[in-house]
């Protein structure tokens, strides 16, 4: 239930602020993962089906949104520009696998709703030092804190819909910041 409330809150945020159209890519990205998580909550999808479905969607999404991808990695305090060493599809594959890794890591702790929620809160606060999507990030923080309050009262739980939704929000934000630092995207 908590994931549904957070998802509806995010959609309402974009509708109220009249920037639904400008953020279509973001909404499609997080909506897909939310729906996979919701279907899993309702019908207990197999883990291989979820993994393959999310892999295919993410890979196709990244192909059609070339500005959103991992461009640099930090290895032993040295920034490595992947564009200098790898072709486009290799970078898309690495980005896809990174998103799925984060998604599954967060999904593994979704049974511990408080830990999952606070991990997302700390991550979003840390990432907001770049001031990208600042307003929506604080709104999402408000939604997560509200969820956490009701979770502590044993009134709601995050579920796979919530963990998939929050992991997609976090991965999109990380990728957007990475792309923006290289000047590949414009601030929204």
Predicted stretch roles:
Residues 1-188:
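"…together with the soluble PPM/PP2C metallo-phosphatase catalytic core" -> "…together
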